[in-house]
Structures are given as structure tokens and as C-alpha cells.
């Protein structure tokens, strides 16, 4: 009787151990919406002669973008400024969702729009301490350029973004160091 129980337990144990090997492999995930993505990262830095916390107080609110990008209108259309999930609208059309933050940084993403190829655009603005009295602003962009025609178009797009955001970093430096920006040019 005892040997029958031992044999039954051994058989059950063997079946349990073999079950995962006999289980069906999980189904393959559905294909990617963009199967041949061409992700790029554009990282720009600007030295600032102020402590990081002081810099962040000047340029780090989610809609401060309107102050350091002259002529750009920013409004919070969902959530609360500075809280995860807050949505800002730029110039009445571009939406950006606050998806991550630290005491001296935030990251945003642009949502998917119907009828447009999604480029997975994300941006991060950070005030990074360098010394007790100095810091640097770091602006990082990550996006997919696969919808652009060729390498020349991708290079042009990256250079355009780098130029625009490098100017924004210079303007943030000016404001953080106590300066004022010139009013936007008349259109």
C-alpha cells in the first residue's frame, strides 16, 4: 500500500515537473505598428551660473515653456500643472502629457493622433547640479524618424530640432541668471 502511494506521488510529481515543458508556447505578440522604427536621441546641454534648485524654480514649471520660448502659448487643459498626467496645449494644438518627474526634471510625451503616424516623441528637461553654485540644463528628445523619406530628411529634422531646443536652453539660461528675453518678433 505504501509503495503504491509512493509510486502515485512520484508519477504526480513527474507530471507536474513535465507540464511546463509540454505546455504550448505563448502566441507571438501582434506586429509592431511601426516595424522598422528609426529611433534617435538628441541630447543638448547648457551651463548655468546658478544652483540647480534655483534654476528649476525659474524654468521648471510645466507651462514655463511659454516664458522661455517667446511667442509660445501654453495652457494646462487637463490635470494640475506639475502633476503626473497633466496635459499642456501649446499654441492651441500640440498636446503634451507629463509622464515622469523628479524634483529637478520632467518628461513629457505627445499622444497618438488619428490619421497620423506616431513618432513616439518624448522630451525631458532637467536642471542638473554641477557645483553648489552652478548647474547645467539638459534637454533630451527621443523620437522615431522612420516616417521621414530618407537619411537627408532625418538629418534635417534632427538639426532643426537641435537648433530650436538649443535656443530654448540659451533663453532658459538667460532667465535663470536673472536676465530678460527680447519680445518675440512680430509676425
Spell out what each predicted region is.
Residues 53-57, 63, 163-170, 174:
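Solvent-exposed, polar/charged alpha-helical surfaces in well-ordered, non-transmembrane soluble domains
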Residues 47, 64-70, 74-122, 136, ...:
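Glycine-rich portal/gate segments that line the openings of hydrophobic small-molecule binding cavities
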Residues 1-11:
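Bacterial N-terminal signal peptides that target proteins for export
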